[in-house]
Amino acid sequence: MTQPLITDVETEFGIGRLHRYRASEPMKAVLVLGHGAGGGIDARDLTAIAESFAGSDLEIVLIEQPWVVEGKKVAPAPTRLDACWIPLVHAARGRDLPLIVGGRSAGARVACRTADDVGAIGILALAFPL
């Protein structure tokens, strides 16, 4: 598996973590994905996407929410997830490139709720809970 560049980012509610799978130059867009409430970024669909696009012109960034970095087992309220997600996405985006956000399950919900706030041009929702 390709090894990501890992960066810690301070948020209002603790340190989140970016796992950046570098794209080839010139990069065309950034895809930022979050994990679900019951698991981490090692979910099979998230790792498959990161591996499939590694070295392409699409940079993939998997985000670990602060509660996961802290080792907690239960996700906080959606408002707190959103408050942590927004600065993490801004840090993940870096350059002024088209941004696609998404995630697995609860991560997809966070991405949908905050897509306008972060300036996303699209959303990729995996295992989206109804």
Give the positions of each predicted feature.
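Short, hydrophobic/aromatic-rich segments at coil-to-beta transitions
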Residues: 1-8
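Residue-level detector of functional hotspots within protein domains
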Residues: 4, 51, 109
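Serine-hydrolase catalytic machinery in alpha/beta-hydrolase-like enzymes
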Residues: 9-99
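Primarily recognizes the serine-hydrolase "nucleophile elbow" in alpha/beta-hydrolase
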Residues: 85-130
